[in-house]
């Protein structure tokens, strides 16, 4: 009896194994390989490759033969062997661009423009630790004459926006578009996206995702074709979508140009390099890229976890791929589509972002363990807007409290910009110091007169910093600031302690945004053909004035060390423009409007409610309407976001006893 049971289970096990080998259970699993030193991450591998002996030698794609030459690039080169980090003073990446030999091409000019005025630029080769070579490639793939001080390519980066590999590179790193896997050196070379010729230099268009959830019934599927066109069908179609030898009818389909890619859920992209131009189209459209056995390196795969935004599939298993796409959970689809939009906006929407991402990866290699962690690269706002020089702890940034489960801080530092002393300044100090959340007060003395010998007695430390005449210096990251939260004020600001307390409590719920009392709004002026802005009381707003606003101190670091010098110069030349510039910066990071809280009394820069107001109101400072247009041109787009919401305390102006209200002074005239 026991022998019969053993025989039965042995036969059942053999039958089950036979079913698996014959493909009766077609769904395959994909897992991530363990991290290997010097290898790019984010590539799944298929567990059942050994079971598909008939596909072990895949046929060569004739389209790839002429595009994948095997080029000697110094295959033994690694980061430690071929790059001298000792030349980077203070471990800060500075680059010098060799002048292109011959006429400057359009691609070279766009690269040079993206680096102009950036924090990476150096004036001479002696000040740089990385020399940038922009090859003038011909049809044969030759780089042209090598620059002086080539030194075998050591500490050089050969950068090309197009997939045209060069020869005679020696120890130089190569950053090119869609490099083939057989010549790419992981951990040393860099993979760029294939950019169209009309790709914007700065800013760039936002993502085009219109519908987060797939259409009910059938999920739309787009298949990349030649010349940037797409075939549209559904996941219920046959498996002949990408099989060149299939003679069956692939089912109903429509063809669209890449510019009008509809709101498809999945975009099937063949593995040959001629299809790489479709990758960014899918990313911008919010269409999940399904890469069919790609033979090219995904862009920035060294730092971007593409498993959160794309699917790597085996083109030899069409039935299994379609079945897996049909069975994907809606929550997984939503997460993938949201990640495509973040990656597009953070790293790929402009030439400037692509070039700066390339350099930031090299900067991370120089820093080593002090560089950007994976969370910064793969979650908003992205590594380009999260500077590790600010802090090595994620808790010190305003963006990651939700992921880390930490709090933004329980106290603030008041920073008061003083152009002239007066009674209003002394009263403001007393009101701010009376807040239970105030930790310190810093006076930025900008007056030609000497500061007073005596200041009001306060329960918190008061520090005076002299000699800062530039308006942009009010946003300098002073080492005296001891808290993560800043209350930015002017000497003419008039706030009560209750107003300060309530605004700070609101900021604690929105630590990445600005919370202010006085607002402004931008608008498009059809008559002038440009942007305009106004301050005062309107039905919507997109800015808060920094004369009375809470924000995270990280924005001082970003303002000083990330913004191009040309933009800060605009603010210094036009003092009323500094508020606009700070709001541009925060809106670029958050993609959200600021928060407005109630303000109970008139401010010198605010517009009076009506002409019958009995209180004398000083003339508002004239606004330079050209400022906002110059800033929009510098950013490459208009980042400001409008809002019609103001946050008030509970019971604010409700017909109840004032004794029941927590912030009573907010309603006092």
Curated annotation (Swiss-Prot):
An example Gene Ontology CC term for this record: endoplasmic reticulum membrane
Keyword Hydrolase assigned: no
GO molecular function: glucuronosyl-N-acetylglucosaminyl-proteoglycan 4-alpha-N-acetylglucosaminyltransferase activity
Taxonomic superkingdom: Eukaryota
Catalytic activity field: 3-O-{[(1->4)-beta-D-GlcA-(1->4)-alpha-D-GlcNAc](n)-(1->4)-beta-D-GlcA-(1->3)-beta-D-Gal-(1->3)-beta-D-Gal-(1->4)-beta-D-Xyl}-L-seryl-[protein] + UDP-N-acetyl-alpha-D-glucosamine = 3-O-{alpha-D-GlcNAc-[(1->4)-beta-D-GlcA-(1->4)-alpha-D-GlcNAc](n)-(1->4)-beta-D-GlcA-(1->3)-beta-D-Gal-(1->3)-beta-D-Gal-(1->4)-beta-D-Xyl}-L-seryl-[protein] + UDP + H(+)
Gene: Extl1
Taxonomic lineage: Eukaryota, Metazoa, Chordata, Craniata, Vertebrata
Subcellular location: Endoplasmic reticulum membrane
Lumenal-side segments: 30-669
Similarity field: Belongs to the glycosyltransferase 47 family.
Protein's name according to its UniProt entry: Exostosin-like 1
Transmembrane segments: 9-29
Residues modified by glycosylation: 263, 480
